[in-house]
């Protein structure tokens, strides 16, 4: 059921018994201080929609005891088993069955124990970034040109980025920056998304703890999520400490991934059992 929360956002309950968490994984990690949350960025032109393909897929692994955060990006063209749909690009799982099937796909293919998620579209992402005052990012000239091309296609009143190098991006500009993929590779696109998220974390760390609740409520008003405001606020104390942030991409170099045409589409294929 989708419920409009008291903070102004959408809370969607998921069937936690149908998320593909194996008994072995549940027993192994169920009592640790590590929490894994799936983040999805959906590809939609409807500003108020949270449906469609998951154009961005990230797992945030939070170790409260060690104050460690891992940002694990899963490339959208990864070919995986999707329950009821055979082997396909992982980006399709969200379109087929929403967050539940997308989480189940991650758990079953990568031996995870994810039970919570947050989904945002790129329009809402722009609003979320603006809440924190934008981000400062070092961009290349190629990125600047493509950013302006995409932005102009989306919005005739788009504010162009006038120079490359270290620049301040508005929410709309940073959201478009996160979507660039034609000029290089999906790996480079994931790197851009991680840069934006790391900037947002740094921004949040410089906010007074007394404002955390208002910040979380404002941000969650822009998402569809299985979590409540108190659940998200339970991670806030980590912001006042030194956080270690590690970033990873799946498939990585050690996965021996091979890119190529499979069933008429370009995908990453690799041995998930290895």
Residue ranges and their predicted role:
Residues 29, 50, 130-211:
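Flexible, polar/acidic helix-loop-strand segments at domain edges
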Residues 96-158, 226-232:
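Amphipathic, coiled-coil-like alpha-helical scaffolding segments used for oligomerization/assembly
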Residues 54-56, 87, 91, 99-107, ...:
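Extracytoplasmic/secreted envelope proteins and their assembly/folding machinery
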Residues 46-49, 88-96, 111-116, 164, ...:
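Second-shell loop/turn segments in exported
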Residues 32-35, 52-57, 66-74, 85, ...:
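Extracytoplasmic
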Residues 1-67, 234, 240:
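Entry/capping segment at the start of metal-dependent catalytic domains
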